Amino acid sequence: MFHFKLTPELRKELKDPLGKLIRGEIPKPYLMIREELERARHVVTVGDVVTENVLRLGIKPSLAIYDHKTKRQEYSPDIESDAVIMTVQNPPGTITKALLNAIKKGFGLAERGRKVYIKVCGEEDLAAIPAVLYAPEGSVVLYGQPDEGVVLIKVTPECKLKCGRLMSKMEVVRDGD
């Protein structure tokens, strides 16, 4: 098995939002993008606070990826659901094969009308990158930008290329090597 590891150079690059930053105090950013979320092919949320706030709008994400933490502190979001729930290991600063597989499988189920929630043991901070790669065009991926707002990524061919380039800049670590 293997995983992708964040490099110091890429960490700096990822400080910039991958999509459009919608600023404001909760719930303002979510109310501003509500119609866009309702029109999206799939809504993907990355993070506990983002998932919780999208659910409060009455929108159930096709795919939700969360780790029961916010700003490195334990957090118990109000995310009770009838979704298919998968649990994966994903250490901080990495994208594991298990996370990639869960996201890919999640979209397969979402395309058949199921809601899928991926509970990450570790950290889900980088999950937006593979979520964009596996999401069908016309989907929207949301993640939080702490103390600033929420980032909305419209999944397009250009956006997929950008995320593919980001993945290619990560260090590939073979587990057990």
Curated annotation (Swiss-Prot):
Its EC number is 2.7.1.237. GO terms for molecular function: GTP binding; kinase activity. GTP binds at residues 48-50, 67, 69, 124, 147. Keywords: Coenzyme A biosynthesis, GTP-binding, Kinase, Nucleotide-binding, Transferase. It catalyses: 3'-dephospho-CoA + GTP = GDP + CoA + H(+). Coiled coil: none annotated. One of its GO terms (biological process) is coenzyme A biosynthetic process. InterPro entries: deph_CoA_kin_Thcocales (IPR054930), GTP-dep_dephospho-CoA_kin (IPR007164). Pathway: Cofactor biosynthesis; coenzyme A biosynthesis. NCBIfam families: deph_CoA_kin_Thcocales, PRK01160.1-3. Belongs to the GTP-dependent DPCK family. Catalyzes the GTP-dependent phosphorylation of the 3'-hydroxyl group of dephosphocoenzyme A to form coenzyme A (CoA). This is GTP-dependent dephospho-CoA kinase. It comes from Thermococcus onnurineus (strain NA1).
